[in-house]
Amino acid sequence: MACPLDQAIGLLVAIFHKYSGREGDKHTLSKKELKELIQKELTIGSKLQDAEIARLMEDLDRNKDQEVNFQEYVTFLGALALIYNEALKG
């Protein structure tokens, strides 16, 4: 039986691959795929405007190829984890 952290990491990977490759490269997220992932998989997703998602995409896309690769996605998750941790502190 997998440990909870193993399961959580597996879920993060599975969610990336659930949305990646619907358009173009199966190992990256397009802007449309990233938007869909955020809106369907994160509570904050329904609150973000298109302009905010576009800015997020620009910030995440470090290599400026107009797609978010897995490393860029993990950077995003790390930033979210820091925000969630701060919220728990109160």
UniProtKB/Swiss-Prot annotation:
UniProt: Ca(2+) 2 binding residues: 61, 63, 65, 67, 72
Coiled-coil ranges from the UniProt annotation: none
GO cellular component: collagen-containing extracellular matrix; cytoplasm; cytoplasmic side of plasma membrane; cytosol; extracellular exosome; extracellular region; nuclear envelope; nucleus
Domain EF-hand positions: 12-47, 48-83
Keywords: Acetylation, Calcium, Cell membrane, Cytoplasm, Membrane, Metal-binding, Nucleus, Phosphoprotein, Repeat
CDD domains: S-100A6 (cd05029)
Family matches, as PROSITE patterns: EF_HAND_1 (PS00018), EF_HAND_2 (PS50222), S100_CABP (PS00303)
Keyword Membrane applies: yes
Entry-annotated residues carrying N6-succinyllysine: 47
Residues with PTM N6-acetyllysine: 40, 47
Principal location class: nucleus
SUPFAM superfamilies in the cross-refs: EF-hand
InterPro entries according to UniProt: EF-hand-dom_pair, EF_Hand_1_Ca_BS, EF_hand_dom, S-100A6, S100/CaBP7/8-like_CS, S100_Ca-bd_sub
Molecular functions (GO terms): calcium ion binding; calcium-dependent protein binding; monoatomic ion transmembrane transporter activity; protein homodimerization activity; S100 protein binding; tropomyosin binding; zinc ion binding
Binding-site residues for Ca(2+) 1, renumbered to this chain: 28, 33
Residue(s) carrying Phosphoserine: 46
Subcellular location(s) of the protein: Nucleus envelope; Cytoplasm; Cell membrane
Recorded topology in the membrane: Peripheral membrane protein
Gene3D superfamilies registered for this protein in UniProt: EF-hand (1.10.238.10)
Post-translational modification: The N-terminus is blocked.
Domain of life of the source: Eukaryota
Record-linked PANTHER family: PROTEIN S100-A6, S100 CALCIUM-BINDING PROTEIN
Further facts: This protein co-purified with the prolactin receptor.
Protein name as it appears in the record: Protein S100-A6
Organism: Homo sapiens
Taxonomic lineage from the root: Eukaryota, Metazoa, Chordata, Craniata, Vertebrata
